[in-house]
Amino acid sequence: MELKLIQGCVSEDRVSQRQLFETYGNKFMAICKRYMQDDMLAEDVLMESFFKIYKNIKKFKGEGSFEGWMRRIVVNTAIDHINKKNKSVLRYCEEVKDEAAVLPEVINNLSTKELMLMVCELPVGCRTVFNMFVMDGFTHKQISEHLKIPEGTSKWHMSKARILLQNKLKRYESDIRI
């Protein structure tokens, strides 16, 4: 099934391209929304990603997962978009106080959607590094290369993202206790 779909897209068959989009569009839109705060920007990144997938599908050699290959294009497109729009923002993330850890039961009571909304509220630099490191498995070295920032800055953004999320979780915890 997947091989036939790939071959159809290589041949620029519109039905195959539509089927590929319908099969993976929602999954990849979730990735785009993790990186972009605005749904319209997320849709733009998704469309640009599929354009790149269709354009470069001939380069897929069948080594590894096809979905993984496409996912990398989606993530890289989102990162490229952030780099273009926010060159200076990636170098700065607001300073916050480090507080005690959040109770594990608070995290367990959160839905995935609620947690992802908290991640989306992070400043762009922190959110981008958090997504790349935690969600997409990049190392700090890879993040620094992709975002063209020092490796230490990547680690700093990750640390600040963790602190900001802890603060959000504490506010959530105090809200549910009231």
Task: Locate predicted features.
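N-terminal module of bacterial RNA polymerase sigma factors
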Residues: 1-27, 34, 120, 141-142, ...
